[in-house]
C-alpha cells in the first residue's frame, strides 16, 4: 500500500468499522449486566493465575471487553479515526483480518510478558488492535498531518506513530503506567508490521 493508492472513502463509517463499534458497544453493555462472568470467562488471563487459567478464545475475546467508559470511548474513537481510511484502502475483508491479527498478536505478547513478570491480572481492551491500525495508518499515509489530543501539535502521521511507539516502549520498560498493558500495544504494532510485510512480499511475487 502507498499513499497514491488511497481513494476518498464513500462512507465515513465503513462496514467493518461499524460492525466493530457495535460489537464492542454490545459487549460493554453485557459487562454492565454481569461484569464478573464476562471478565472471568473472556478477559485474557495469564496462565499463572490460580483461579482463572488461560483459555485459547481469550486471545480474541479480551479485545472486545473494556475496563470503563473512558477506556472504550478512546479505543473506539481511535478505531474510527484511523481505521476508516484503512478499510477503504485494504478492503473490508483484509482490514478485518489485519485488525484481528493485531488483537491476537497483542494478546500473545502480553502473555509472554506476564509469564516473565509473574503477572496475575487480566488484560482487556481493543488497544492492541487500535495500535496496529495506527501503525498501518502511519505507513500508508506517512505524510498526512495529524493533531494528537496531547500535545495538540500538528505532525506527520509517521512521526506520530514513531513517537507513540517510543513512548509505549519507555512506559513498558520503566513501569511508568501501572495498569496499562504497554507491551500489548507494542505487540499489536509488531504483528501488524509483520503482516503488512508479508502481504507486500506476496504482491511482489
What do these predicted ranges mean?
Residues 1-205:
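A detector for small-residue-rich transmembrane helices and their helix-helix packing motifs
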Amino acid at each position: 500500500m502507498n499513499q497514491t493508492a488511497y481513494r476518498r472513502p464513500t462512507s465515513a463509517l465503513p462496514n467493518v468499522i461499524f460492525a466493530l463499534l457495535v460489537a464492542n458497544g454490545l459487549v460493554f453493555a453485557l459487562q454492565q449486566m454481569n461484569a464478573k462472568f464476562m471478565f472471568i470467562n473472556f478477559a485474557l488471563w495469564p496462565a499463572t493465575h490460580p483461579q482463572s487459567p488461560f483459555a485459547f478464545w481469550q486471545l480474541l475475546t479480551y479485545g472486545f471487553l473494556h475496563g470503563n467508559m473512558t477506556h472504550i470511548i478512546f479505543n473506539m474513537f481511535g478505531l474510527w479515526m484511523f481505521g476508516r481510511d484503512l478499510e477503504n484502502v485494504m478492503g473490508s475483508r483484509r482490514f478485518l483480518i489485519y485488525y484481528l491479527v493485531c488483537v491476537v498478536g497483542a494478546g500473545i505478547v502480553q502473555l509472554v510478558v506476564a509469564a516473565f513478570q509473574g503477572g496475575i491480572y487480566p488484560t482487556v481492551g481493543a488497544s492492541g488492535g487500535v495500535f496496529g491500525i495506527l501503525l498501518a495508518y502511519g505507513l500508508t499515509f506517512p505524510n498526512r498531518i495529524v493533531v494528537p489530543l496531547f500535545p495538540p501539535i500538528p505532525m506527520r502521521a509517521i512521526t506520530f506513530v514513531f513517537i507513540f511507539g517510543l513512548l509505549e516502549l519507555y512506559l513498558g520498560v520503566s513501569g511508568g503506567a501501572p495498569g496499562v498493558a504497554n507491551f500489548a500495544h507494542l505487540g499489536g504494532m509488531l504483528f501488524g508490521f509483520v503482516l503488512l510485510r508479508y502481504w507486500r512480499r506476496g504482491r511482489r511475487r
